[in-house]
């Protein structure tokens, strides 16, 4: 089931052992650390789960003590009242982690996601060029989508950091929790942590509009109120960037429309068609030579795109992306075929990520 990592000394104290695990995460560039009773620790490295050997199975007491040592009393009270908790945790110069705590079978389960201290550049992530041009736009809505763990937060952070280096803008982020930490360069940036600095995305978004923002980052558009307010913010002359757990461009447009009641949907289609600037849908694949690489579906708003959204024809967007590759649009299958043709990923891995394997197969044969 798992790969194996031999490393940690079993006799260490609980907190010392945890810090050693975090160091191991950094060394292996693991994306996640899983601690769950009654298993030994498990790291996810390049998308593969790997068991850390030489540590005895974690006990319920171990987990209680560890959680109590890394949360505030208020956070612990919240967890006891509602046994799910998400927060960020800094370990001085060692690491910054996004932590998710829950109970399973009566015991605490923890997942730690590693957040790199330095924000990666757009170039280093291999992001499409639209990430640079879109983030410099004065207004509109930019969406970064993909499944959990596909790097959406990192893409958004790279875009905001590029803006921070190139333009003077007032930026307000609303995150759950705050992941990457920005320092002011050319931009003035405020970061609000859901549950600590604000009660909800919707409330924070409404109040952000009163703070003279140029750019608003909404960590995730989770509900109808947040989506509606984000669209209105884009309509009133702000640049809004957010994320959704959708796998491609057409599904993204449909998901936004479908959260509204039927009597509202045509109006939302009209509004969305007017404010949307770009949708970047991404997924991660294992590289043949080790590590992972992103594949990106890219839609850039133009008159044809806006017309299809307005006329309830999101299913035709892939056709528009295919014929407008000269301006930077591309379908996911096109991105996957390029990765296979370049020898970066295997055909088998690409097929598993494609929503239309037969179409991808034809592209590869062509």
Locate each region found by the language model:
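Short, flexible helix-loop junctions that flank or precede catalytic/ligand sites
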Residues: 2-366
